[in-house]
C-alpha cells in the first residue's frame, strides 16, 4: 500500500492548533528550534 508520511505528527492535529493562538507562538519557536 502507498502511505505518504511527510511528517511524524498527524496533520489533522496541526489544523486544530492553527486555529489556536498558542499555535502562532509555537510556530515561531519551532522555526528557531529547527
Swiss-Prot record:
Keywords noted in UniProt: Chromosome, Developmental protein, Differentiation, DNA condensation, DNA-binding, Nucleosome core, Nucleus, Spermatogenesis
One GO MF term attached to the UniProt entry: DNA binding
Region of interest: Disordered: 1-34
Domain of life: Eukaryota
Keyword Nucleus tagged: yes
Main location: nucleus
Tissue occurrence: Testis.
Segment forming the signal sequence: none
Keyword Cell cycle belongs to the record: no
GO cellular component: nucleosome; nucleus
Cellular location(s): Nucleus; Chromosome
Role summary: Protamines substitute for histones in the chromatin of sperm during the haploid phase of spermatogenesis. They compact sperm DNA into a highly condensed, stable and inactive complex.
Protein's UniProt name: Protamine-Z1/Z2
Organism classification: Eukaryota, Metazoa, Chordata, Craniata, Vertebrata
Amino acid at each position: 500500500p502507498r502511505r505518504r508520511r511527510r511528517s511524524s505528527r498527524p496533520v489533522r492535529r496541526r489544523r486544530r492548533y492553527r486555529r489556536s493562538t498558542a499555535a502562532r507562538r509555537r510556530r515561531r519557536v519551532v522555526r528557531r528550534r529547527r
